[in-house]
Regions:
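Glycine-rich phosphate-binding active-site loops on the catalytic face of alpha/beta enzymes
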Residues: 43-48, 123-124, 128-130, 197-207, ...
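C-terminal helical cap(s) of enzyme catalytic domains, especially alpha/beta-barrels
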Residues: 51-64, 208-226, 285-311
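Alpha/beta catalytic cores of nucleotide-metabolism and tRNA/nucleoside-modifying enzymes
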Residues: 231-254, 264-323
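Conserved, mostly hydrophobic/aromatic
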Residues: 18, 41, 80, 93, ...
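Glycine/Thr-rich beta-alpha phosphate-binding loop at enzyme active sites
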Residues: 65, 133-141, 191-255
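Catalytic cores of alpha/beta
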Residues: 27-33, 103-111, 178-192, 246-250, ...
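N-terminal capping/small domains of soluble enzymes
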Residues: 1-91, 95-101, 297
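Short beta-strand/loop segments at the ligand-binding rim of alpha/beta enzyme cores
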Residues: 10-17, 88-92, 159-178, 246-260
Length: 323
């Protein structure tokens, strides 16, 4: 059974890895992923400087999923550059900035560490969709800003890596979209640029879960509002993957899709691939189950594929039937 996949020149021995979020901030957590059945190691979304994040409690989960308002706690971008050599698997740095200038500075430093110092950085995932930064909106919901950000990002990326053979793959992490014309607009914007992949979806922002016993919110920041994940968001995640798959297909753009949101079982993984995902990330389930989640979900996916007489994911990827 072949579960391997690729994004551009970067090959993965399976189709399942961690999502940038839980348990990927510190070196020991990254090494734990490196020694697991995750096909890659993706860092916590990093900023220019180290951040403590939002006040606690800032994470809560139940049987249906999770809510968080972490606020991007991370070790600062130099930390993830420094320890890249400790990781054997494909290593993808997730990054962002609180302004375009900060984002470009972080991106430039990451790329220069690759070109000038041969650091092991295999990919860059630019997070334009964190819903949990107080008083900061999500860039990917402002389409004019999204276009401008991608223009600047791709200019720096292309110029600094112009003579470099195996470039780090470049992708963006998107929020969930809900309107068909939003998929059209964002699909058109992204298709203009040399983007290798998109990750969709990030958590659904400004959700609220209630502790009925105490008649209170379950997390502290933002009046209890946070990003919703887990099973709650799977239908939205599937829809976003499917819509962007169709958008890129009609534009003849080979932009790969990383599906994320509510993947708990092999059946969930199969559904995402059927909708058009090339690679899958797990966040909430990884937080709950730790690294054993990768082996179990991959085993279950293999069983679903065997039952349906599929030998590799290419045989059913994107082939969702409509009725």
């Amino acid at each position: 059974m072949n579960l391997s996949t690729s994004i551009s020149h970067l090959k993965f021995n399976s189709c399942l890895c961690n999502a940038s979020g839980p348990k990927c901030s510190l070196l020991n957590e990254l090494q734990n992923l490196d020694n697991s059945d995750s096909c890659a190691v993706i860092t916590k979304t990093t900023t220019f400087e180290k951040r403590e994040g939002n006040p606690e409690p800032r994470y809560y989960d139940n049987l249906l999923g999770s809510i968080n308002s972490m606020g991007l706690p991370n070790q600062g971008h130099n930390y993830y550059i420094k320890y890249s050599e400790k990781i054997k698997k494909p290593y993808i740095i997730s990054m962002t900035g609180f302004s375009l200038d900060e984002l470009i500075t972080v991106l430039t430093n990451i790329i220069i560490s690759k070109t000038n110092f041969n650091k092991k950085i295999d990919g860059i995932e630019i997070n334009l969709s964190c819903p949990n930064i107080i008083d900061k909106g999500q860039i990917a919901y402002d389409f004019e800003s999204l276009d401008n950000y991608l223009k600047e990002i791709c200019f720096i990326y292309s110029n600094l890596l112009e003579k470099f053979d195996e470039k780090p793959i470049l992708g963006i992490k998107l929020p969930p979209y809900f309107e068909i014309h939003h998929f059209e607009t964002v699909g058109e914007i992204i298709s203009k640029y040399p983007i290798d992949f998109i990750t969709c979806i990030n958590s659904i922002g400004n959700a609220l879960l209630i502790d009925i016993k105490n008649e209170s919110a379950v997390i502290k920041p933002k009046g209890g509002m946070g990003g919703l994940g887990g099973s709650y968001v799977k239908p939205t995640g599937l829809s976003n993957v499917r819509n962007f798959y169709l958008q890129f297909k009609k534009r003849n753009r080979d932009i790969k899709i990383i599906g994320c949101g509510g993947i708990e079982t092999g059946k969930d993984a199969f559904e995402y691939i059927l909708c058009g995902a090339d690679l899958l990330q797990i966040g909430t389930q990884f937080y709950k189950e730790d690294v054993s989640s990768f082996k179990r979900i991959l085993k279950e996916l293999t069983e679903v594929m065997k039952y349906k007489n599929y030998n590799n994911i290419e045989q059913f990827k994107g082939k969702l039937k409509t009725i």
